Amino acid sequence: WIVQKNGSLIQNAGGNQDGEKKRYCFQDVEENRYEAPLLSDVPKCTYDFSDLKTDEQTGYKSYQDPETGAKAKLGIDVSEFQGEVIDWKQVKESGVEFVMVRLGYRAYGESGSLVLDAMYEQNVKNALEAGLQVGVYFFSQAVSPAEAVEEAEFVLEHLKHYNITGPVVFDTEEIKWDSARTDGNTRQDFTNYCKVFCDTIEHAGYDPMIY
């Protein structure tokens, strides 16, 4: 519908009176502009971002819907790129309620190897010990339904020893700085692989999500 970026609104592209489908505009982090059809069977987001608050001391943002009472939770996203030393006690005491841990990724080169994040085990164990809710995400480079299932099964294998109550996330991204094995995927391909991954995760009893 309307996408908010850095506090500014990008206007709906709209449609005409001849039955043309409405489209919406959005920007990525590099400010590239895109348009996509507005799906009439998908409910519009009801959040009013004018109710988004920023704590002056911590810089943390909070949101509570004045009508429904729905309240946002504060969380962080970590991977090996945050290094080996995270003070999880301090994370918990700062007000963080949940953490999304990168479980792994499929390399975007030709081999497409499945790789466990170097800090996955340590991050999950320490976050759980600190009393945080934990979810995980996997960076996908699937180019077939079979590879999407393979990725999901890789994730499930590495989840089974932990009490993961947060979402299990399918993370697919456009590789802008290099060539990638997914460059030939169509929009429908990405949709199909996402669905296959999420269905496999849900069948195993976890809550799937899309980054």
Write out the residue ranges for each language-model feature.
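Boundary/entry segment of secreted carbohydrate-active catalytic domains
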Residues: N6-G104
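Substrate-binding cleft of extracellular glycoside hydrolase catalytic domains
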Residues: Y60, T68-V196, E202-A204
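Aromatic-lined carbohydrate-recognition surfaces of secreted/lumenal glycan-active proteins
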Residues: I201-Y211
